[in-house]
Amino acid sequence: MKNRGRTKPKKNQWADHYTQKARDENYPARSVYKLMEIQKRFQVIKKGASVLDLGCAPGSWLIHAAELTGPSGRAVGIDLKPVDAALPPNAIAHTGDIFEMESTLGEAVGQDYDAVISDMAPATTGRKDIDAARSFALCEAALRVACGLLADGGNFVCKIFQGAEFKQFENQVKSRFTSHKIFKPDSCRKSSKEIYIIGLGKK
């Protein structure tokens, strides 16, 4: 006779694996493994580089960027939410809204960065078209910041939700960088619409 009681929902083994791995390795979130894969493939952050992390909370990308650039470099982050995680000596996090601060962001965080990275994502609604449009708006803001604050030859990493605006944003990146790549890390959920656009060598 079958058990008609409630069955326990299956655990998300993917999330459990990366969440536990991040905890074991002292990172605030599993998203760090996406940056690790991007770095391994494209070497967007060099030793001694200066890196700006847009949407840096809870701090995993900022911490790893600081590790990659080393003590002779620096990693600067900005997010609406404060970063509570302990940061390396060469990393600092600012609290603020890049939309509100866009015209004065250079005064707050400096300029001539070697890399600008963005793992920003909008508050999701469950409507794929709306979520993709909101993601596109964040990406355009990130690209404007990157174009204003990157040194010539600098690199750009940006997460975007795939949708109707994806090709438009890809073309914007393509026009501003010597080369560009589209990449979905293995550590992303296979069902996720998120993907990364990497701009290499700001023109």
Swiss-Prot record:
UniProt-annotated catalytic positions: K159
Keywords associated with the record: Cytoplasm, Methyltransferase, rRNA processing, S-adenosyl-L-methionine, Transferase
GO molecular function, a single term: rRNA (uridine-2'-O-)-methyltransferase activity
SUPFAM superfamilies in UniProt: S-adenosyl-L-methionine-dependent methyltransferases (SSF53335)
Main location group: cytoplasm
Official protein name in the record: Ribosomal RNA large subunit methyltransferase E
Gene from which this protein is expressed: rlmE
Reactions catalysed according to its record: uridine(2552) in 23S rRNA + S-adenosyl-L-methionine = 2'-O-methyluridine(2552) in 23S rRNA + S-adenosyl-L-homocysteine + H(+)
Species of the source: Desulforapulum autotrophicum (strain ATCC 43914 / DSM 3382 / VKM B-1955 / HRM2) (Desulfobacterium autotrophicum)
Organism classification: Bacteria, Pseudomonadati, Thermodesulfobacteriota, Desulfobacteria, Desulfobacterales
